[in-house]
Each structure stands twice: as C-alpha cells, then as structure tokens.
C-alpha cells in the first residue's frame, strides 16, 4: 500500500511539473511579439539592430525635418541631440505630433531608416514618455520644469 501511495505522489508531481513547463512555454510564445525594447537614437546609431528586430525609438522630432509625402507617408528625423535617425511612417500621425516635440515610434531599422508601424506623441505639454525622458537625461539635454511630472 505504501508503494502505491509513493508511486501516485510521483505521478502527481511529474504531471504538475509538465503542466507548469507547458504553461511557461505557452506564455513565452504568446509574449514574443509583445516585448519591444526601447532605444535612443544614439544607441541605434552605435549598435544598429537587425532588420527583423522590432523595437521602440524615442526622442525629439528634429526641427525642419518633417516632410509629408504622397498620401499618408511622412518622413522626419528623431534625435537625442547626439545622434539622429531618419524615420519613415505611413499612416495617420497623432494630432499633437510636431517638430521639436517628444515622440516614441515602434518599428524596424531597414537600410538605416527606421520604418515605423506606430507613432506616439506626448499628449500635452507636461507629459513625455519615461523612456524618452531617461534617454534625454542621459544625454544631458532634458530640462525638468516645475509642472512636469517626474517619471
């Protein structure tokens, strides 16, 4: 009788381990496209990611760089004042998207041009995405104002 209980306990533990491993594998598989790493323009220029890697880039839209092309295609440059990366986006830009304003884009770097699939802009004068603030602070160009929340 004791041998049967021990055998049953081992079977339950083994089954629980297999279920846990399967659940972990399914969660990892489901999240593989949902994790995008943030990079500043300086990081992109210094160590360009592969063309298949989806990542986020953030900084300020360089003054005088915004060019509206055919249809919904827009090109501009994003900078952290140390490096600049050209960006190409086809779609509708957020209403508050403007030159010399903060932005975060999601996409891939293809032939030195960031091909954005999504562009986000700061929603008012006091908000800037935390990743952009951190990158600009690291470059020494971020100026904190009284009414600006700290990330």
From Swiss-Prot:
Its main location: membrane. GO terms for cellular component: plasma membrane. It comes from Cereibacter sphaeroides (strain ATCC 17025 / ATH 2.4.3). Keywords: Cell inner membrane, Cell membrane, Cytochrome c-type biogenesis, Heme, Iron, Membrane, Metal-binding, Signal-anchor, Transmembrane, Transmembrane helix. The chain crosses the membrane at residues 10-30. GO terms for molecular function: heme binding; metal ion binding. Heme chaperone required for the biogenesis of c-type cytochromes. Transiently binds heme delivered by CcmC and transfers the heme to apo-cytochromes in a process facilitated by CcmF and CcmH. Residues 31-151 are periplasmic. Residues 1-9 are cytoplasmic. The gene is ccmE. GO terms for biological process: cytochrome complex assembly. It is a single-pass type II membrane protein. This is Cytochrome c-type biogenesis protein CcmE. It is found in: Cell inner membrane. Belongs to the CcmE/CycJ family. The keyword rRNA processing does not apply. Heme binds at residues 123, 127. PANTHER family: CYTOCHROME C-TYPE BIOGENESIS PROTEIN CCME HOMOLOG, MITOCHONDRIAL.
